[in-house]
Amino acid sequence: MTDRTKSAAGIVLLTLASGQFLMTLDSSVMNVSIAQVAEDLGTTVTGIQTAITLYTLVMATLMITGGKIGSLIGRRRAFMIGCVIYAAGSLTTSLAPTLTVLIIGWSFLEGIGAALIMPAIVALVASNFPPEGRPRAYGLVASAGAIAVAAGPLIGGFVTTNWTWRYVFAGEVVVVAAILMLTRRIQDAPPEAKHRLDLVGAALTAAGLGLAVYGVLRSGEWGWIQPKPGGPEWLGISPTVWFILAGALIIRIFFAWEARVVASGREPLVRIEMLRNAQLNGGLTMFFFQFMIQAGIFFTVPLFLSVALGLTALETGVRLLPLSVALLLTAVAIPKYRPQAAPRTVVRWGLIALLAGVVSLVAALEVGVGPEIVAVPMLLTGLGVGALASQLGAVTVSAVPDKETGEVGGLQNTMTNLGASLGTALAGSILIAALTTSFIQGIEDNPDVPPEVSSGAEVQLAGGIPFVSNAQLEAALAEANVPSAQAEAILAENEQARINGLRASLSVLAVFVVMALYFTRLIPMEPVGTTSGIPAEV
């Protein structure tokens, strides 16, 4: 490869990685700026959380359709149209005077733009890099997204603390403009022959995925199976179950519809035969587990640092830097220095490193520890996620012909969104359940807490207690005129309950890492840059 060719490839990679970084940055920034955004817009924290939920929902429901649109009109064109829509959403968000305008700009416009951009990125990497160069390219693009999750609190905290959260979204408009200027250097994948978009299939996927994801996102409020006290219920069961079942039923109808479309000679939204491809299934399954575990970690660790230890958003971001650095270096180094490494072996070692990071953090969590305990676990986690990022993108795309990479991009991003939604919801619900159980048991057994107080707390807090800092709890106890001896006992029990909740949540994530190890058998042993043909179906 000549220096000029290397320079062109570098620009393409920078452009696509920047797009991936932006798509992931928003939620991370918004999560650390919720209070400031709510105050600025004159709304509540619940209102901002609704906007976050809708953003995830729009992306998850439209990813498959966005991938197919890219296949029909051209991936670069879809990428550019998505960037324009995304920039319009960012500008609207930066100027939003009310929650309604924020939802229009951020949740809907940015969500629609992301649904066009992210599948196109997957396909454009395939059309701009030879098979042997794709693992490194996909690794860098994937690491850009993961780093955005880790860097979001750092960027959001710094900008929000020193200026205003609006500058983050205004800055995104400038970045998108730069990305659009560089897209002329990107080689487009030729679009498919002109077909009509399968609108019925698009509606079915949007409805099915939307219902399932919405049920998962509301599980913390509704409960998973047993409804929470005072919460809604249908036939004595939490609505979460019904939403997920309804979504699964509609997805089953979608598969039947797609088979009918193929039988009639029309172009389907998704070629169902692709899902019988063992290698593709393996890659998609690993993406699901990676993002579920990754999202759970990015939910629990910042909570520990910011709430339990009282660190600022900026300080929290700094403590996550070992993960970001290790992730980036690993994602780049493995394809560069071990290009012939077996993908299955790399993925397995990545999961082992990820497991070691989670387990070591569980072991280190104690009342009274400082923020330094997360350094080694975050380093190990970064090594693990980086190893996965270096392989999975190339594994999924190499499983199909290049003309189908747009559809694979839609499927891949659907699985990552589902995984991230489920990971955050599971981590949060398990943490609150364990925190509540531990706290109630603790004050019942504590001799400094009168029986009437502990029994009253058991009734009032049965639906779950919030994960609050010592300062927040002290203020609440002082306002309630709780005697100092009782207040100190309650504070001590809350500290221990917080740690127990974090341990429980992380322990469940460790179990999912072990489960993911089982499915690595679907990942090929032969380096994907050297494979020829399409793997056997199952």
What are these regions (language model features)?
Residues 71-209, 218, 227, 235, ...:
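Helix-loop-helix hairpins in multi-pass membrane proteins, especially solute transporters
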Residues 2-3, 180-209, 222-236, 260-278, ...:
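Flexible interhelical linker loops that connect adjacent transmembrane helices
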Residues 1-16, 20, 260, 279, ...:
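Transmembrane-helix exit segments and adjacent C-terminal regions of multi-pass membrane proteins
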Residues 34, 148-160, 334, 423, ...:
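Small-residue (Gly/Pro/Ala) motifs that create kinks and tight helix-helix packing interfaces
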Residues 173-191, 208-221, 246-262, 517-524:
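C-terminal membrane-cytosol helix-exit motif in multi-pass small-molecule transporters
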Residues 73-88, 92, 96-104, 117-123, ...:
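C-terminal module of multi-pass small-molecule transporters
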